[in-house]
């Protein structure tokens, strides 16, 4: 796929995201939306046995709204293990399993499959479109949830610095649970990664998402520890 064609596809997806977002706002019933805020803390360990292959384990901690005194601090924790493979420099494939423990005792199992094509616009910008298919099983409700998450992301780099900003928009589409609901929620995010050295990456990000009945603000921090056994 050449650059001009990928740009057209990316612009098409951006237009679709924008139209769906506006449609969701105009078609939603007049209900009072709740405002919620949370914090996410991520820790990942990645190992590269080959240049195009990454094995990873991760832990994500979710905290409730710290501005509400009566709210419980702990919300959920996600433990994941997976593999990321790049058959081509412009395509990434990912498969992962995630164990979730939620406040209240509910345990969930999630399987994730992703494909992410990308292309460099210039020396400083890269655009990607990621399709993520996930299945989540709730032990408490004994039910399955099938979801498709479509994300358009723009990654950048600041010349002569180890800083890498990015922005994205992501659409959550249920596949089975409610076929009449084409879009469950839409999220917009912005973040910044700091590549400290070859083995350490720090990140901070903010995400705003909205559904028919709620707004959600998420502030996150992340740390990635990387190892490799091949010569760069």
Features from the language model and the residues they span:
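Cleavable N-terminal export/targeting peptides
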Residues: 1-30, 228-232
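Start-of-domain marker
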Residues: 26-84
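Residues that define the transmembrane beta-barrel architecture of outer-membrane proteins
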Residues: 35-39, 75-79, 107-111, 142-148, ...
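Membrane-embedded beta-strands of outer-membrane beta-barrel proteins
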Residues: 43, 81, 113-115, 150-152, ...
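Residue-level signature of outer-membrane beta-barrel architecture
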Residues: 47, 85, 117-119, 156-158, ...
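Repeated loop/turn-to-beta-strand initiation elements of outer-membrane beta-barrel proteins
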Residues: 51-57, 89-95, 122-127, 160-165, ...
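Transmembrane beta-barrel strands of outer-membrane/channel proteins
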Residues: 57-61, 95-99, 129-135, 167-171, ...
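Outer-membrane beta-barrel "beta-signal"
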Residues: 115, 217-232
């Amino acid at each position: 796929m050449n650059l001009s064609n990928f740009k057209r596809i990316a612009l098409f997806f951006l237009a679709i995201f924008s139209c769906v977002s506006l449609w969701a706002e105009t078609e939603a019933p007049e209900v009072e939306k709740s405002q919620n805020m949370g914090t996410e803390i991520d820790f990942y360990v990645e190992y590269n046995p080959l240049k195009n292959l990454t094995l990873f384990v991760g832990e994500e901690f979710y905290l409730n709204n710290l501005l509400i005194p009566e709210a419980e601090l702990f919300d959920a924790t996600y433990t994941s293990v997976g593999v990321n493979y790049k058959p081509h420099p412009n395509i990434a494939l990912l498969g992962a399993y995630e164990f979730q423990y939620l406040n209240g005792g509910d345990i969930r199992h999630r399987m994730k499959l992703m494909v992410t094509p990308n292309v460099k616009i210039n020396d400083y910008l890269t655009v990607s479109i990621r399709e993520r298919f996930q299945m989540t099983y709730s032990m408490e409700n004994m039910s399955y949830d099938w979801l498709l998450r479509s994300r358009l992301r723009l990654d950048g780099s600041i010349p002569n610095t180890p800083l890498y900003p990015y922005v994205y928009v992501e659409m959550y589409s249920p596949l089975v649970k409610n076929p009449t609901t084409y879009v469950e929620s839409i999220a917009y995010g912005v973040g910044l990664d700091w590549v400290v050295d070859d083995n350490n990456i720090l990140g901070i990000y903010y995400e705003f998402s909205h559904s028919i009945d709620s707004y959600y603000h998420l502030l996150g921090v992340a740390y990635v520890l990387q190892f490799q056994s091949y010569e760069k």
